[in-house]
Design a protein with these regions (language model features):
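Extended mixed-charge, aromatic/glycine-enriched low-complexity segments
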Residues: 1-263
Length: 263
């Protein structure tokens, strides 16, 4: 996350985890967004948040991320959330610049020797920026990730058509906006040149088991650390035996959980 203000780039927050702690899907991305939103709401009242991101529909342009936004607006002191998806191949955001700075710093470090553990990457990210505010790192564990798919089910969060009767295709959205005062709907555009927002009403089925965003409790996405494949684990153990990975780093690798599934 990269804060932008009138003077340019502000504080950068980097959320990091390895594959034994989480995957790279909507639950993980959404959990990071919720942590960020909770922090922003605690630091400033009635904040209006605008996110800029790439167009990765699988991770951040779907109804599970939207459900997370509705939850945040219901729970936190946030006035509105707007998410703008940048046009593929035509835009570059501040996040791209941050990634470039980190990548160059890592490449320089690799000239001095190997990087053996995720902790070393954390240190490199924290020291990558040489001027201004250093990058902050939030290290995520499996216990930090919430199940946004479950949240969507618990609240019967659903929608099909906009107010004009057109089927809503989030994959085509360029801008999505949700307002605290109107949590029964969200607004979206399919292009930046579109003059008016399209309105989408949220359809929630009423049953005895339904919960609202006000009273729902977030469920954990994982109950334990995630296993890595046996093939990958065996490869790492081989590198340890050959001393390609130094023995002093063995506690981290020995702590990894291995899958019983056959590759």
């Amino acid at each position: 996350m990269c804060d932008l203000n009138k003077t340019g780039q502000g504080q950068v927050e980097c959320f990091m985890w390895h594959e034994g702690q989480g995957r790279r899907g909507s639950n993980e991305i959404g959990s990071c967004l919720l942590k960020y939103l909770e922090y922003k709401a605690s630091a400033q009242e009635n904040v209006e948040v605008v996110f800029y991101s790439d167009n990765c529909a699988g991770q951040q342009k779907n109804k599970f991320i939207l459900a997370g936004y509705f939850y945040a607006l219901s729970k936190y002191n946030i006035k509105s959330i707007t998410h703008k998806y940048l046009i593929r191949g035509h835009t570059q955001n501040e996040g791209d610049n941050v990634h470039s700075v980190i990548e160059k710093h890592v490449k320089r470090a690799l000239k001095s020797g190997p990087i053996y553990t995720p902790d070393q990457y954390v240190s490199l990210v924290q020291t990558a920026k040489k001027t201004g505010l250093p990058y902050k790192v939030q290290e995520m564990s499996y216990a930090d990730f919430v199940d946004l798919k479950k949240l969507s089910e618990q609240t019967s969060f659903n929608f099909k058509k906009d107010s004009s009767g057109e089927v809503v295709k989030l994959a085509n959205a360029a801008i999505i906006r949700i307002e605290k005062e109107n949590l029964d709907k969200f607004l979206y555009k399919t292009s930046y040149s579109e003059p008016e927002y399209r309105v989408v009403e949220i359809k929630q089925r009423t049953t005895r088991t339904n919960q609202t965003f006000d009273n729902v409790k977030l469920e954990p996405a994982y109950r334990d650390i995630l296993p890595i494949s046996k093939k990958k684990y065996d490869g790492l153990m081989f590198l340890l035996r050959m001393n390609t990975i130094k023995k002093c780093y063995s506690p981290f690798y020995n702590s990894l959980k291995v899958s019983n599934d056959v590759d």
